[in-house]
Design a protein with these regions (language model features):
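Outer membrane beta-barrel transmembrane domains
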Residues: 149-153, 159-164, 168-219
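Outer-membrane beta-barrel strand-turn architecture
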Residues: 68-72, 99-103, 115, 129-133, ...
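Outer-membrane beta-barrel initiation region
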Residues: 28-90, 94, 227
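Membrane-embedded beta-strands of outer-membrane beta-barrel proteins
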Residues: 62-64, 95-97, 123-125, 161, ...
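Cleavable N-terminal export/targeting peptides
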Residues: 1-49
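Transmembrane beta-strands of outer-membrane beta-barrel pores
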Residues: 54-58, 80-86, 101-103, 111-115, ...
Length: 235
């Protein structure tokens, strides 16, 4: 992957000229894929649980969800997450609130702090389109605003959405797209999911897919493979 400072030597969105040196600061935000999509709420068991993510590139993540109010039909939860670089340094710290409906619909509002880089506020929603004993289909969307520590770099928005399908809680697939207008950048991803193990208190999934970022500032964009494991534990 190219460093953004090597690619963006003529950045001038809306008559704003940014010094090339500032792109070193933007590189983790533009390239770090884990921060594109915020934590979403959807159809899950309504009890305290956490998940650990281990990616093939060495990055990892930890998420927790704590229900604190609700009834048999609606639930509110506190959510938090940590993302780690391949060197096991904290890349992002996230906290927020989530709402879930028994029909599989959900909303979330999160605040993410990226140490040494900046902050991101995101709102996300999930809409269940179809559900029965064998099939589940969700649509999701999000909007996020990122503000960097360097005041010379303008804040920017990212919006996106996608579809997720699951068959018998065993095999699934998803597609998504995210758009950052300030950099004329579009991110595409397609993933597959296979459940390897599940019991009453835990599950282990394998995920793999392809992702691609397209921008005038990325001259040789190509599809890149992604893979990882997700372990989830209910308490």
């Amino acid at each position: 992957m190219y460093g953004v400072n090597q690619l963006c030597k003529k950045f001038d969105p809306q008559n704003y000229v940014m010094p090339v040196t500032y792109f070193d600061e933007l590189s983790p935000v533009l390239i770090y894929k884990e921060q594109i999509h915020p934590i979403r709420a959807g159809r899950e068991r309504r009890q305290l649980h956490g998940s650990m993510v281990f990616n093939s590139d060495g990055t990892s993540g930890l998420n927790m969800k704590l229900p604190f109010a609700g009834n048999n039909r609606n639930m509110f939860s506190a959510i938090s997450g940590l993302d780690f670089t391949k060197n096991q340094k904290i890349a992002a710290e996230t906290a927020g609130l989530a709402y879930e409906n028994i029909r599989g619909h959900g909303l979330s509002l999160t605040q993410t702090h990226m140490p040494g880089i900046g902050d991101r506020t995101a709102a996300a929603g999930t809409l269940n389109l179809f559900h029965n004993n064998n099939h589940n289909l969700d649509a999701n969307a999000f909007a996020a605003r990122t503000t960097l520590n360097n005041p010379a770099v303008p804040s920017f928005n990212t919006v996106g959405g996608g579809l997720d399908y699951m068959f018998k809680n065993k095999v699934g697939a998803g597609v998504s797209m995210a758009r950052t207008p300030l950099f004329d950048k579009t991110d595409y991803s397609a993933t597959g999911n296979l459940n390897l193990f599940r019991d009453r208190s835990s599950s282990l999934d394998f995920k793999a897919g392809l992702s691609k970022s397209v921008s005038p500032f990325i001259p040789r964009s190509s599809w890149e493979p992604t893979a990882g494991f997700v372990f989830k534990k209910f308490f």
